[in-house]
Amino acid sequence: MDRVLEWYRKKCRLEESRLAACLDVVRGVESRIALLAAERAAIERELLARAAIPAADFANLGRYRLRANKEELELQVERRRRLTEADEQRARVRRAQQRVKLVEKMRERRLEEYTAAAGRELENLAAEAFLARWSREHEG
């Protein structure tokens, strides 16, 4: 039973480490989204802070905004996909934790049954010893 429990614990730790990796990926995507937003704001601030803005720069800003919007949408899609993966992994972790708890309870129950059986056996031996002693004392 101990080997089974240890195997389930190892499996649970493995699932937990996979969840941590999933969450790291989510944080990485969120970081890329934040960096893109900061870059976009900095470029727009820099351009709009100029006294005179050439028409070509406005055209370039428009193209940049389109590309940045497309990239942000792609990152948001990736973020949702990664969050879904993390939720699925979180469910696997919960199932693994439940299996560990179940095996622990089974082990405890088996120990209680063993202890109770050992106690009954000890009582029977004590009763037999008492009866044997009592029988010897009252025969003679």
Name each region found by the language model.
Residues 1-140:
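Charge-rich amphipathic alpha-helical interaction elements
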